[in-house]
Regions:
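Sec-dependent N-terminal signal peptides
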Residues: 4-13
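Short, charged juxtamembrane terminal tails flanking transmembrane helices
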Residues: 182-187
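Mature extracellular "passenger" or substrate-interacting domains of secreted, surface-exposed proteins
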Residues: 21-157
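A short, hydrophobic C-terminal helix/tail in secreted or cell-surface proteins
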Residues: 158-180
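N-terminal signal peptide c-region/cleavage motif recognized by signal peptidases
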Residues: 15-17
Length: 187
């Protein structure tokens, strides 16, 4: 009986998948100054854990491009230390100055752009311009939120929801009832 319960518990925990985690990044007046790699740009890093797998990105942002800069020039890169990653250009089709809001999400897995972080676990973000208008500094500003979905390499098993626990406990109860009934029948 104890071996049966142990086997059932092992099976329950072995069938759970790794849990996705999210990183929500609040943006408040994050300026975009120059081309990628410029020391003037805003660069952030977040430690998500060694070899974490980046699986999705969502954004809800308001961008302002100062004339003569265009909204389509504001870019943020999401990269590993080894520079694997993606570029996000929310206003890609908007070739004008001014302010506009953009919101969307994407599964990087579904579009074949998912990537893993390096052993240092750092996700790097750089806010930059795809074309630097030298006559204006900064070229633009970001406000809103960016959300990164990822799976840590060492994610533990999922924690069952209450309904799952109830179903699992009911199953254990039935196994116990059957074992007791069998034992009474043999006595």
């Amino acid at each position: 009986m104890n071996k049966l319960l142990l086997g059932a518990l092992c099976a329950a925990f072995m069938t759970t998948s790794a849990q996705a985690a999210t990183l929500v990044i609040d943006l408040e007046d994050v300026f975009s100054y120059a081309g990628e790699g410029s020391p003037d740009n805003v660069v952030w890093n977040f430690n998500l854990g060694a070899n974490s797998h980046i699986t999705g990105i969502a954004y809800d942002v308001t961008l302002t491009a100062f004339s003569p800069s265009w909204l389509s020039e504001l870019v943020v890169s999401f990269t590993s230390t080894g520079l694997d990653g993606v570029y996000l250009t929310p206003g890609f089709a908007n070739s004008s100055s001014g302010t506009a809001s953009f919101a969307a999400s994407a599964s990087l897995v579904d579009i074949g752009l998912d990537f893993s972080l390096d052993a240092d676990g750092l996700l790097w973000l750089e806010f930059f311009e795809s074309f630097n208008d030298a006559s204006v500094n900064p070229d633009g500003v970001w406000n809103g939120t960016l959300t990164v979905t990822y799976t840590p390499e060492n994610a533990g098993p999922a924690v069952p929801e209450p309904a799952s626990w109830a179903l699992m406990l009911s199953g254990f109860g039935l196994v116990g009832f059957a074992a007791r009934r069998r034992r009474l029948a043999t006595n």
